[in-house]
């Protein structure tokens, strides 16, 4: 039987030009991460020769992407100064937007915060009101540098169409229609806008700010909803239909509870902070009247849990067990061995984490004799709130690197 011919254009080799482009991308990424490096440092990190690095940085300087700074430094031999990303770039206003809160900070060309951190509770009832809240936060962010050119990078809770920059569905919001965030904000503010999911923001922050050295990982955000994002082969995995990482909508129970997505028994109905509060109140109503139902929020649940309230303890451990089992089922197909947890449920602490871990690590395919760094680890994320929001600025960096020579 004759071999089938390769599909035209499906397999492309790397000619010398593409190798140079790859190396330029690598150097630019290092400069963004390090905030500045010498030629010798770049050569050491990339394992390229000094002459090869010289050609790369000279080309990047000529293109206006990189600048050379003279630095007073006692050294033997020639010292070519420090190379940094060009200052001829707009600032970036980074935002995280949910139906109840907006957080924002402005960063400079090196992705260093240059404004006050905005953390504002909001109560929009319509998409138009949400747009007004976003614009108000942008104005507050730009108070320190009102005349500086800028661009927007917005992380949105829920499903996002990244191609057109729209919020397709925002759970917990009092509306159901799509919001064309990119179009509306670009038309109103006359700036460039990128929009993505809030879990992607966390994954970008972990990738660029927490030094994972190219490891695959999953970020799991367990808050009033549950979402996730994956870094695979150093790239954020999004999927074709913008639905990747929707672990919160795995069906885990026939509990009769309808999720915000319209289906019954999703993980969010069992393990999110909203679900924990509802389950506690349901159980507490049958036990004793210790809690005022109308004012009960997740912080109240955490206090009860930390004070060894038996109902809160049981509800939290049940949720952790289901969450761990779901993680196992979800991740065993991808064989990702690093899971990083964020969200308000992390306030439940180490016992909650241990229960999740015990369920997640029941993996018959994991080699007990594997290297420590190859074993599965479930841990809390350690980035600060500001660092997480700054993560959205790297959406622009990744776009620049992807389009470096297109």
Residue ranges and their predicted role:
Residues 114-216, 351-362:
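Glycine-rich phosphate-binding loop and adjoining helix at the ATP-binding site
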